């Protein structure tokens, strides 16, 4: 029973994104669908992508949109740092300090941060690892953005990532594959794994919301000529895998595969006793 459950977890969480990767590679990288779609958005007379010249569109979809993942990362980082403060405060030795913290409601914030230290640290690590993976791939494939290439009025050649990939060194100056802005939206998938730890009933809605956010982020850049559509799909695949591989050592497979809570059940942050015997998948002991 445990073996079949484990196999299903890995098949679903690794198998589906890997199947999507194969599909994207065959449908987009092996064809000219990306170029055909971008051609529809390009004005061949003016030699521009019209939406690239709309200042408000750029500000709304590229600059302001970053607030969501940026603030999430900043809140997680602040929470992770605060989580180490409460254990250092000895209210029995310093009752006046303890009283002040209680009156100012700071104590409840510090206790909350301490109780959710693992979650805050996970989000920080997941965001950092996702960013690192995307930056590595950008540097080691050196793909230029459509708007920079000769296909759309630029001066640089159009190249496919698999023709340019270098494992141990940077491949050039191109930094377009996979989609960086899309990956910013997809990194919100980290919150889905936090929700899975607590078996939140709406965790799937959170997952779909993060996927939609990343897709919207990526699509807006496609409309401006700064990415091909496949760049968004690749970003989602890599970010999912990075978040999943980060969540496994933080929370453990046994916890992540548990069914969501029903209305009458109370959430708990710890795995059930009968699942704790699965040592390879047991989460770390810190809170």
Residue map of PLM features:
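Juxtamembrane loop-transmembrane helix junctions in multi-pass integral membrane proteins
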Residues: 50-64, 115, 172, 198-205
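Interfacial segments of alpha-helical transmembrane regions
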Residues: 92-140, 203, 207
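Membrane-interface interhelical connector segments
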Residues: 142-170
């Amino acid at each position: 029973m445990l073996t079949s459950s484990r196999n299903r977890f890995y098949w679903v969480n690794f198998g589906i994104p890997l199947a999507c990767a194969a599909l994207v590679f065959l449908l987009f990288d092996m064809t000219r669908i990306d170029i055909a779609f971008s051609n529809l958005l390009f004005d061949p007379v003016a030699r521009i992508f019209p939406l690239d010249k709309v200042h408000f569109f750029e500000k709304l979809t590229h600059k302001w949109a970053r607030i969501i993942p940026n603030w999430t990362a900043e809140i997680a980082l602040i929470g992770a740092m605060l989580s180490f403060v409460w254990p250092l405060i000895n209210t029995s030795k310093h009752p006046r300090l303890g009283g002040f913290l209680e009156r100012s409601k700071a104590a409840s914030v510090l206790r909350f941060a301490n109780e959710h230290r693992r979650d805050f640290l996970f989000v920080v690590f997941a965001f950092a690892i996702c960013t690192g993976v995307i930056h590595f791939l950008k540097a080691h494939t050196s793909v230029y953005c459509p708007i920079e290439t000769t296909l759309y009025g630029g001066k640089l050649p159009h190249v496919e990532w698999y023709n340019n990939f270098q494992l141990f060194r940077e491949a050039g100056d191109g930094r377009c594959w996979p989609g960086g802005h899309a990956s910013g939206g997809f990194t919100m998938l980290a919150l889905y794994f936090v929700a899975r730890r607590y078996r939140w009933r709406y965790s799937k809605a959170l997952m779909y919301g993060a996927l939609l956010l990343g897709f919207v982020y990526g699509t807006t850049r496609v409309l401006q000529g700064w990415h091909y559509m496949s760049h968004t799909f690749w970003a989602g695949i890599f970010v999912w895998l990075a978040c999943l591989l980060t969540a496994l050592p933080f929370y453990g497979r046994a916890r992540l595969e548990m069914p969501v809570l029903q209305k009458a059940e109370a959430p708990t942050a710890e795995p059930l006793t009968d699942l704790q015997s699965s040592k390879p998948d047991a989460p770390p002991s810190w809170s």
